[in-house]
Each structure stands twice: as C-alpha cells, then as structure tokens.
C-alpha cells in the first residue's frame, strides 16, 4: 500500500509495472518514519473507516474499527430529522459518516483543536458544519442527540499503550485526566435533554453508569465490540426516552 501511495497509482498498477520507479529519497523518508514507530496511516496520510477513505495525520486520532460500532448505533437509533452534534470530531469520521449514511439528519461537528478541525474540513467536503468549541460552549441551541468518542484513557495508563499510539497520536485526544471519565462527565453536564451515544474504555462501564445516574440519565443500551468488551453506551435523560 505504501508503494502505491508513493507512486500515486493503484495497487493493480504497482503489480503490473515492476519497472515503475519511486524517488529513493521518498522511500527512505517513509521507511525512516516507520522505523521510528510512526503509524502507517500517518505516513500514508489516510485510512479507511466505514468503507470510506479519510485523511489523517498527527493532528488527529486514527479512526478505529471499534468506533464503527458507535456510528452503526447512531445510524440505527437516531430519530429522523434530528439535530446531531459530534463532540471532539477529530478527523470528522463519525460526523461525516453519519451525515452521509443518514442525509435526513442535521449534523454539526465540534472540536476544541483548530488543527483537528482543519483535517476534518478536508474530510467533510461540506457534508457537515464544523465549529470550534470546547464541547458545547459555543452553542445556545439545543440538540436532539450527541455522539462522541471522547478522550477516555486514564492518565496513568498512557505509558501502557502501544508505542505507535503513545508517542505519535495527539495526547489530548487520548486522555482527559486521572479518572478517564472527566470529559464524559462534562458532556453529561452540558447535554440538556439530548440523547447520547458515547464510546467508552475497557472497564469503564460501571463508572459511566454511575455518572449517568448522577446526572439523571438512563443507560438504554450497551454495545460490545468484537472482543465482547462494552464499547458504546446509549443514554437518555430520565423521562425523555
């Protein structure tokens, strides 16, 4: 795949044209980056998510397969014509995919990082409205649904992550603090009557249940990933299912 990217040609071309040459300096630069532990997705400048290609670089997290469960849940559960906000959009993969799969929805994507929004803008191509905001601070309007893959890694667990993640992906998008639930708590504080679809960490379900109850939210559904780990929760305000 990397050779295909360097040549700017599909894999079929690469296999059929063995004589095709790539500037050796470009190969050397790419190999040095890979040997330094940089994720292949950053070197290629793109990755696949939900059957679509998204641009990625060190300004945003690399979309994971687990997050496709969040998107599937949103596509299935969100009411027709709803107003939806994706908090902490990063590359924009969640917001863009939901908007394209459910064109009846009005989707807005937010991020506190201007750098991340620049990447999201390349991926959105006008499909969603992008707003720089610390969670929902920039809004006076209400939303029907909030979707988010927030930072959720406990600060003490950062050093246990794979080197590719720990040393290359944006730290602020990985961990919110010691508990790992700090941003989730803030989202619940600001959610109003909106339903929520959130990605959570391994072992975090009970803490999220407690936070939801403290903020008067029901846990309506829990979706597991392929390893059987609770990965996505659906929440609604008491009395607003």
What are these regions, as identified by a protein language model?
Residues 2, 37, 67, 94, ...:
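Residue-level signal for inorganic ion chemistry
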Residues 3-76:
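Conserved AdoMet
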Residues 44, 131-133, 200, 224:
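Short loop/edge segments at beta-strand edges and connector loops
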Residues 53, 106, 127-129, 218-221:
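Conserved beta-strand segments of alpha/beta enzyme cores
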Residues 65-160:
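Conserved SAM/SAH cofactor-binding pocket of Class I
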Residues 152-182:
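Mobile active-site "lid"/loop adjacent to the S-adenosyl-L-methionine
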Residues 178-236:
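Conserved Class I SAM-dependent methyltransferase catalytic core
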Residues 238-241:
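Flexible, glycine-/basic-rich loop-and-beta segments that form/coincide
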């Amino acid at each position: 795949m990397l050779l295909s990217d360097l040549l700017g040609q599909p894999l079929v071309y690469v296999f059929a044209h063995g004589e095709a040459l790539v500037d050796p300096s470009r190969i050397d630069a790419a190999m040095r980056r890979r040997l330094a532990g940089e994720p292949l997705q950053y070197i290629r400048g793109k990755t696949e998510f939900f059957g679509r290609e998204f641009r990625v670089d060190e300004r945003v997290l690399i979309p994971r397969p687990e997050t496709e469960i969040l998107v599937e849940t949103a596509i299935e559960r969100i009411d027709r014509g709803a107003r939806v906000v994706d908090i902490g959009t990063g590359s924009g993969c969640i917001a863009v995919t939901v908007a394209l799969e459910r064109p009846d929805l009005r989707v807005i994507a937010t991020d506190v990082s201007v750098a991340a929004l620049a990447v999201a803008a390349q991926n959105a191509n006008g499909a969603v409205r992008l707003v720089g905001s610390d969670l929902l601070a920039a809004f006076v309007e209400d939303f029907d649904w909030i979707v988010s893959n927030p930072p959720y890694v406990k600060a003490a667990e950062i050093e246990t992550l794979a080197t590719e993640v720990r040393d290359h992906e944006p730290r602020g998008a990985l961990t919110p603090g010691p508990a790992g639930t700090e941003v989730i708590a803030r989202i619940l504080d600001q959610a109003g009557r909106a339903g929520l679809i959130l990605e959570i960490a391994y072992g975090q379900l009970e803490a999220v249940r407690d936070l939801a109850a403290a903020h008067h939210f029901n846990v309506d559904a829990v979706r597991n990933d392929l390893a059987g780990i609770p990965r996505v929760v659906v929440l609604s305000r008491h009395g607003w299912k």
